[in-house]
Design a protein with these regions (language model features):
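N-terminal cap/lid subdomain of alpha/beta-hydrolase-fold enzymes
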Residues: 1-48, 330
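Residue in the alpha/beta-hydrolase core beta-strand immediately N-terminal to the catalytic nucleophile
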Residues: 26, 78, 106-108
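Alpha/beta-hydrolase fold nucleophile elbow
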Residues: 71-84
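Catalytic nucleophile loop
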Residues: 85-90
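A catalytic-pocket lid/entrance helix-loop region that shapes and gates access to the active site
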Residues: 93, 97-191
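Histidine-bearing beta->alpha loop at or near hydrolase active sites
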Residues: 112-114, 315-316, 341-353
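Alpha/beta-hydrolase fold catalytic core
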Residues: 173-320
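Active-site-adjacent alpha-helix of alpha/beta-hydrolase-fold enzymes
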Residues: 318-341
Length: 353
């Protein structure tokens, strides 16, 4: 929820520091990381850092340097990335192998963002949202009794199957869908989403996440739900509109994480600096050209038969939905020959585990 100052930090009882070293990397302009002048006194070009492939390249080089300086080439190595970091680690898996000759034991993606789906949009991207709508509506007690009376994990497979088997084909028909089929699909979408059949038809079966965050509780409390974690509630200036005024969950997290990390670094680690710790970094414009990270991970796995992949997603994450992540895993290796090396874990949480 919304913690009240003063903040504190406490030991994590589930820490793995007794069996592994954890190395956190802040890419340029996040945390305390900044560009510095080169040997000629010139500031490096942003293009060397702010892009899908540039980001992967310099971070792979940093990881090689760190591993060499600390003599950890014989150690097992796992890389983990959250949100955009999911895209990053998919690309790093191949970059590390082919450019740094560093072979990984595992890649872990937490709430990964697959821009092959998110940016392209269309029937698949839209339909993959439905199971997230189901999870959120269940949490807020907005589903029909036949679903609401069951546990979340009992009903999600139903919604997933409907999204793949029925909703994608229906959306793919666009304006040529038969009127009776459109009506039947809208009725079932209402059943699984907690939204009214009327608003679903008004959106021609293609209901955006942002509208869902605004609409689900509109006629009840009038509150909005969070983007990154739909358990959080927000209060907009007006109940009308098609998207929330702000991200309720994000304001809560920044409200607590920012003082905590600054206190810990300065008081516990005794690191003194006036430099601002960036919770978010200025990295735009970001070059998204030639994003082949999904294919890069497949090739890395093909080249390295010991490389395994773990995906962790929260059912209440509306930014990078859990079913989008499941879909991504299924598309990495269409042959299915490596499917036993993929593991998906879902959690009753949001974007942040």
């Amino acid at each position: 929820g919304y913690p009240v100052q003063p903040y504190g930090v406490k030991d994590n009882p589930n820490s793995i520091l007794d069996v592994a070293d954890i190395v956190f990397i802040n890419p340029v302009n996040t945390g305390y990381s900044r560009k510095v002048v080169d040997k000629d006194g010139k500031m490096p070009d942003d293009k060397l850092f702010f892009g899908v492939n540039a980001d992967i390249k310099y971070l792979a080089g940093w990881m090689n340097t760190f591993t060499t300086r600390h003599n950890r080439w014989e150690s097992p190595k796992y890389i983990i990335g959250e949100s955009y970091g999911g895209t990053r680690v998919m690309g790093l898996s191949l970059e590390l192998q082919n450019r740094q000759w560093m072979y990984l034991n595992g890649v872990i993606m937490v709430s990964p963002a697959d821009y092959k789906v998110l940016r392209v949009g269309g029937p698949v991207s839209s339909a993959l949202n439905l199971p997230y709508y189901t999870a959120t509506a269940w949490y807020h007690n907005k589903l029909p009794e036949a679903l609401q009376s069951k546990d979340l994990l009992e009903i999600l497979p139903e919604s997933e199957a409907y999204a793949i088997d029925t909703l994608i084909p229906a959306l793919a028909k666009g304006g040529f869908i038969d009127a009776d089929e459109k009506m039947a699909v809208s009725e079932k979408m209402a059943y699984y989403s907690g939204l009214s059949q009327k608003v679903i038809l008004q959106h021609n079966l293609d209901v955006p996440n942002s509208f869902f965050w605004k609409e689900l509780l509109r006629d009840d409390t009038g509150q909005t739900i969070g983007r990154l974690d739909s358990r959080y509630l927000g209060i907009d200036k007006k109940e009308s509109g098609d998207r929330p005024d702000y991200s309720a969950e994000l304001t809560s997290w920044l409200h607590s994480f920012t003082p905590a990390i600054n206190h810990y670094i300065k008081s516990e680690l005794k690191f003194k600096t006036d430099l601002k710790y960036n919770m978010f970094g200025s990295v735009r414009p970001w070059n998204n050209d030639d994003d082949n990270t999904r294919d890069n991970l497949r090739l890395a796995m093909a080249q390295n038969p010991y490389l395994k992949v773990l995906n962790q997603s929260g059912y209440y994450d509306g930014a990078t939905t859990y079913f989008n992540a499941k879909y991504t895993l299924s598309q990495i290796d269409p042959s299915g020959k490596m499917k036993d090396r993929f593991t998906f874990k879902g959690y009753r949480s949001g974007h942040m585990m």
